[in-house]
C-alpha cells in the first residue's frame, strides 16, 4: 500500500498554508504540520452504488469501471480555489454534485475545525470548473453539461437549484474551464471553454450578451489562464499541439507555441488511442495539455501534457505575447496537477503509485536565472517525508495499484467520428 497521489494542491499567496486533495479529503499543512483536515462524509460507496445504463434489450446493467479493477464511481474533490482575502476555500465535490464553501479558521488548534463548512450547494449536473466574481462574493460555476450558474457565497443554499435559479449562460457541449476578467474600463466578462474548440467571452452580469469568440483551436480546450502581470492576455491549451496566447480584449491571436517536438520523447503506450479508434498498425497517438498556469509575478507560463513526467515553462513577451520555451523540468513521476501562488512558485503533484515513492509534491521557485528561471526548492521538498508519514496514519488515504482514482481523463475529451454523427 502507498499514499494515494495528490489530485490537487494549492497554497496561499505566501505559501504559509498548503491545501491538498487526496481522494475524498482535503488536508491543510503549515510546512510539516497538519493543521486542517476535512473528509467528504457524503461520499458514495463506490463499490455498491453503480450508475445504470440501458442495454439494447432494455435491461438495466451496471456501468463499467473507469479502469482495470477500479471501482465504478469515484468521489473526487476538484478545483480548489481561495478567495482573494484567503479567508475562504471553495471546492467542487463529485459525491453529491456540489460546491462546498469553507471558512478558514487559522486559529483552530483542532485540525478538524480549521476548515468549517459554510455552505454546500448541490447542482443538477457535476460542477466542472469555478471562478470568482463581484469582489469574491459570487462563485461562477460551470457544469459538465454546458451550463453556467452563479452562486452567492453568503446566501443560504437553494433546495432545488433548477426551480429557483436558472443558468446565466450555456454551451451546447461539456464545459471544461471558466474564468472571470475585467477590461481596461473595469467591465467584467466571463470566459468559458468547451469540448467543441470554443472560447466564449460574455458580458457579466449581462451574460446574454456575447462579446466575442476566440477562434483558432481545432481540438477541445481544456484549460485557460489569465496572467496577473498582463491583464489583457489569455493563455489557452487542450487537444491541440500548440499553446495559444491571446489578447482577449481585442480578440487577437498573438502567438502560438508548438510543443510537438518537445514532448515527443515523453510519449509512450499510455498515449495510444483507444482500440476502437486505432489503425491496423496500432500506432495512433492521442495526448493533450491537462493544465496551463501563469507564474504569479514573472512573465512565464507553465503547462504539462497528461501522463508525462515533464513540466514545460514558456517565457512570454509582455508587449507582443510571443511565447518561447524557457525551460523544461523533468521528474521521476508523471505530473498530475500544477498551481502557482503570489511568490512566483509552482506546486506540482505526481502520480506516485509506487510502494517506494518518496515524492508527492514538488515546489518550484523563481531563481531569476534567464537560462534556468525555476528550480526545485530542496528545502520545501523535504516536506514530502513528513506529509507521507502523516498520510500513512490515515487508512482512507492509502491505495494499491488497483484502487488509484483515474488520473488521466483529459485526452478522452477528444472527439472522434462517432461524436459528429
Curated annotation (Swiss-Prot):
SUPFAM superfamilies named among the record's database cross-references: WD40 repeat-like (SSF50978)
Taxon lineage: Eukaryota, Fungi, Dikarya, Ascomycota, Saccharomycotina
Family according to the record: Belongs to the WD repeat TRM82 family.
Organism of this sequence: Candida glabrata (strain ATCC 2001 / BCRC 20586 / JCM 3761 / NBRC 0622 / NRRL Y-65 / CBS 138)
Pathway listed: tRNA modification; N(7)-methylguanine-tRNA biosynthesis
Protein name listed in UniProt: tRNA (guanine-N(7)-)-methyltransferase non-catalytic subunit TRM82
GO MF, one example: enzyme activator activity
Quaternary structure annotation from Swiss-Prot or TrEMBL: Forms a heterodimer with the catalytic subunit TRM8.
Gene: TRM82
GO BP annotations, alphabetical order: tRNA (guanine-N7)-methylation
HAMAP family tied to this protein: TRM82
Predominant place of localization: nucleus
Gene3D superfamilies xref list: YVTN repeat-like/Quinoprotein amine dehydrogenase
WD repeat positions: 72-112, 170-212, 216-258
Amino acid at each position: 500500500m502507498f499514499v494515494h497521489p495528490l489530485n490537487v494542491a494549492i497554497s496561499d499567496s505566501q505559501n504559509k498554508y498548503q491545501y491538498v486533495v487526496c481522494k475524498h479529503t482535503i488536508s491543510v499543512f503549515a510546512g510539516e504540520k497538519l493543521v486542517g483536515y476535512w473528509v467528504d462524509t457524503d461520499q458514495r460507496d463506490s463499490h455498491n452504488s453503480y450508475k445504470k445504463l440501458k442495454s439494447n434489450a432494455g435491461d438495466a446493467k451496471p456501468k463499467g469501471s473507469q479502469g482495470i479493477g477500479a471501482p465504478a464511481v469515484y468521489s473526487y474533490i476538484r478545483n480548489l480555489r481561495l478567495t482573494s482575502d484567503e479567508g475562504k476555500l471553495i471546492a467542487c465535490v463529485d459525491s453529491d454534485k456540489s460546491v462546498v464553501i469553507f471558512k478558514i479558521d487559522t486559529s483552530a488548534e483542532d485540525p478538524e475545525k480549521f476548515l468549517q463548512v459554510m455552505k454546500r450547494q448541490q447542482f443538477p449536473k457535476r460542477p466542472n470548473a469555478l471562478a470568482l466574481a463581484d469582489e469574491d462574493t459570487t462563485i461562477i460555476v460551470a457544469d459538465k453539461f454546458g451550463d453556467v450558474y452563479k452562486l452567492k457565497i453568503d446566501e443560504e443554499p437553494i433546495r432545488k437549484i433548477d426551480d429557483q435559479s436558472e443558468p446565466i449562460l450555456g454551451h451546447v457541449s461539456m464545459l471544461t474551464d471558466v474564468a472571470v476578467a475585467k477590461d481596461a474600463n473595469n467591465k467584467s466578462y466571463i470566459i468559458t471553454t468547451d469540448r467543441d474548440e470554443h472560447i466564449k467571452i460574455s458580458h457579466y452580469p449581462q451574460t446574454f450578451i456575447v462579446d466575442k469568440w476566440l477562434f483558432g483551436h481545432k481540438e477541445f480546450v481544456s484549460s485557460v489562464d489569465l496572467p496577473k502581470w498582463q491583464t489583457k492576455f489569455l493563455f489557452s491549451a487542450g487537444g491541440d499541439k500548440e499553446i495559444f496566447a491571446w489578447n482577449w480584449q481585442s480578440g487577437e491571436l498573438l502567438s502560438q507555441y508548438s510543443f510537438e517536438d518537445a514532448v515527443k520523447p515523453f510519449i509512450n503506450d499510455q498515449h495510444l488511442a483507444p482500440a476502437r479508434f486505432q489503425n491496423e498498425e496500432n500506432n495512433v497517438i492521442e495526448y493533450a495539455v491537462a493544465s496551463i498556469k501563469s507564474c504569479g509575478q514573472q512573465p512565464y507560463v507553465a503547462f504539462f501534457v497528461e501522463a508525462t513526467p515533464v513540466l514545460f515553462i514558456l517565457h512570454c513577451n509582455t508587449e507582443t505575447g510571443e511565447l518561447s520555451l524557457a525551460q523544461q523540468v523533468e521528474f521521476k513521476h508523471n505530473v498530475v496537477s500544477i498551481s502557482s501562488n503570489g511568490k512566483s512558485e509552482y506546486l506540482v503533484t505526481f502520480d506516485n503509485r509506487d510502494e517506494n515513492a518518496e515524492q508527492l509534491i514538488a515546489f518550484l521557485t523563481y531563481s531569476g536565472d534567464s537560462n534556468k528561471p525555476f528550480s526545485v526548492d530542496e528545502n520545501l521538498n523535504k516536506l514530502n517525508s513528513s506529509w507521507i508519514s502523516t498520510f500513512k496514519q490515515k487508512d482512507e488515504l492509502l491505495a494499491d495499484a488497483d484502487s488509484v482514482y483515474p488520473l488521466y481523463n483529459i485526452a478522452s475529451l477528444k472527439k472522434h467520428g462517432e461524436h459528429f454523427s
